[in-house]
């Protein structure tokens, strides 16, 4: 209402200290990952329309034909020696058969191709990528999915199976998350979504990472508060707890440290999570 909207209730005090400001809503995102910005260096293959950090709209892919067609167009823009990496695919939304190497081989049989699923716990690769890492019908490794004839379908589930491909194709979650350009790109994504406080939910947080985050988030114009959760991996529980306490003491206004994330399982929507009957306990 106007300045006199409360006068009907008697004497009031008019506080005009904020009259020249614009109040905008904030939003807290409790499950997100820093690579949501830099991942746009790769080809988007998801179902929903998405806007990249620079404001460009990328249309969703409603069926496998569109996924393959759009990735084929993207492939034509790449140098001959560069792999094709896609991301964002979620088979749950697609009514077609499941993505396999036979689909990706339609794009190229000579260029290695990997498409990360939206949960980043699974990927599908083409025959060239399988060849690069030595996966074949003789491979006996958990996560290397095979068809009824015993041949790899191209689907790889969880890090143990995916990492050999990731290493050779240059898919590095750390560089997608902890470099200065990645942090700034993440902030752009948040800003476009109206997010003012966001986590990075499974962060390595080395000394170098913390130095970069402190410097970049400390800039007056940096638009978001980041609350990273330390990845509880690679050390004894007591050491992780001690490091988390150290991090907490280093918090700043726009970098809140000290949270820890335990990851003990896989992806529910990717069917790699080990949950009890009836499937969600």
Question: What do the predicted segments below correspond to?
Answer:
Residues 248-251:
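Accessory "access/gating" subregions that flank catalytic or transport cores
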Residues 1-243, 258, 262-281:
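Divalent metal-binding segments
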């Amino acid at each position: 209402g106007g300045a006199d909207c409360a006068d009907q209730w008697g004497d009031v005090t008019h506080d005009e200290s904020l009259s020249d400001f614009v109040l905008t809503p904030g939003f807290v995102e409790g499950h997100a990952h820093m690579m949501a910005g830099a991942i746009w260096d790769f080809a988007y293959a998801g179902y929903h329309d998405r806007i990249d950090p620079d404001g460009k709209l990328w249309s969703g892919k409603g069926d496998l034909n569109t996924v393959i067609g759009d990735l084929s167009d993207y492939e034509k823009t790449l140098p001959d020696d560069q792999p094709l990496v896609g991301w964002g695919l979620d088979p749950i939304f697609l009514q077609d058969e499941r993505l396999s190497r036979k689909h990706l081989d339609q794009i190229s049989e000579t260029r290695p191709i990997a498409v990360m699923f939206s949960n980043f716990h699974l990927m599908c690769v083409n025959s060239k990528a399988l060849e690069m890492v030595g996966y074949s019908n003789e491979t006996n490794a958990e996560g290397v999915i095979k068809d009824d004839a015993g041949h790899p379908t191209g689907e790889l589930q969880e890090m143990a199976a995916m990492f050999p491909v990731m290493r050779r194709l240059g898919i590095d979650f750390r560089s997608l998350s902890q470099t200065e350009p990645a942090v700034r790109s993440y902030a752009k994504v948040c800003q476009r979504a109206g997010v003012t406080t966001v986590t990075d939910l499974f962060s390595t947080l080395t000394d170098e990472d913390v130095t970069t985050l402190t410097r970049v988030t400390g800039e007056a114009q940096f638009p978001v508060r980041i609350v990273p959760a330390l990845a509880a991996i690679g050390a004894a529980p007591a050491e992780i707890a001690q490091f988390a306490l150290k991090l907490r003491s280093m918090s700043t206004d726009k970098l809140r440290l000290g949270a820890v994330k335990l990851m003990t399982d896989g992806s529910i929507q990717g069917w790699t999570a080990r949950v009890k009957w009836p499937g969600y306990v």
